[in-house]
């Protein structure tokens, strides 16, 4: 479980935000964002974490302090076998992270270019992609080595658009693996290498980052054009162009590139200092226009020292420095503060101005866009049922009640593909006693679609008449499986706004509609506030031969059908046209 508060990060945000009209204007955005951080909903799509016990522990400690629930470690490593024949670098890294900190990290693989000049490289590279997918890699990370460092045996640079790599990009698209790709670097890295260069602090400590030698390196714009050709040739592959589309200095170029390439996205990693020096109104317009294509990322790194977007020979940052680094990201995105010192001073001696995005856009950048992008790879979610000492009557308000002790989860993603629908976000809480499992759902609506009159004495099932069964109107559903060794065996419960209900014992492909669990429910429709609430009380003896013990974990998925909006939502998307995909269930944990 995550810590129940996030006081250090919140205090930092308060400490660095001045009491100005601009700061006050960000209050509306900060309130929901603070809640998201307390609930650890944010996803950082761009970090590099050394997979050692110490580095992972430090990374998670900082994640907890600043409100990150999930980090994408782009440095997952190669999937090619180790020299001694043992597990690959990727397997070792993923196993350690999943063992020590389950559910906190996803890992991208990197391509091993060994044997580039040998026959069959493309086929072997595709095999690496397929192996990574089988092992659970969430995507492919490609570094700026393409076009700048990697060379063939003749000494020629290997460009991003080399035809030998086309099968790799294509296979990533076929497998649903996004490609996070870095080409080029800031323009200043091509300008004269001297103290007049505005990035001199960085370059003098990293001479290998200077690419101004035209005998060794291509022009800056040539690399961007090379990547553009790749994106155009592979429209079914999603390319996350890191560091704000690899061109944070030219907003018009980024805008045009996103317009031109629907399969292109951009992360923010290590480029807010550059984006933030632009006119904040221009930046805000760009973010509003492309709000579905921008992803939160920081380039935060945890190795023998912390790296806050970039670094040089300065003293190693502390954990407190890391918290301030993240707090400045929140400040830039959530307030309208002007002319303040950015989060990575080594990247330039200038100030930045905040863009104060509305909550509806912030949530997309902070986590919704990443949830859709990574929908196939995200770890299964967990609904934690709080234990109560005595049974609870149904119909009591969720607020100011035992229900408030239960941490909510949300049904808000389209079951088929993970698209998020915040307007219909349905919260779910769980409690359990010695005899019952309790579920409470709260569902906003625009217009209810129900069978009238309600059928009180019999379940509404008409398999021979399409459109005449309970699930053909508005319902909420819970699929609960107590047998971890029998994934196709579970109980299906449905409740409509009219409080019509249905229970089914499922043993795929069979469904027993005559079976009865004896579960009870209440349904309350608040037409003034457009919310309908449902509570269920399910006898545990109907769900399992033996009652759960504290700490037990069952399988669970939750769904909602909203016919007026043609919305078929899931807690964990099934990625198919059916809700009955037990491989896509999450978890129900019975807390002590």
Locate each region found by the language model.
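Bacterial N-terminal signal peptides
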Residues: 8-22
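An N-terminally biased module of ancient metal coordination in phosphate/nucleic-acid-related enzymes
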Residues: 25-103, 381
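Active-site gating/metal-coordination segments in enzymes
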Residues: 30-33, 87-211, 215, 262-265, ...
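Alpha-helical scaffolding within the catalytic cores
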Residues: 31, 54-59, 82-96, 123-128, ...
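Hydrophobic faces of well-ordered beta-strands that scaffold small-molecule active sites
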Residues: 43-47, 70-74, 105-109, 140-142, ...
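Acidic-and-aromatic substrate-binding clefts and catalytic sites of carbohydrate-active enzymes
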Residues: 47-56, 77-90, 114-123, 150, ...
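H/E-rich (His + Asp/Glu) clusters that bind or coordinate divalent metals
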Residues: 53, 215, 221-229, 238-378
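Structural preference for beta-rich elements and adjacent junctions enriched in aromatics
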Residues: 379-592
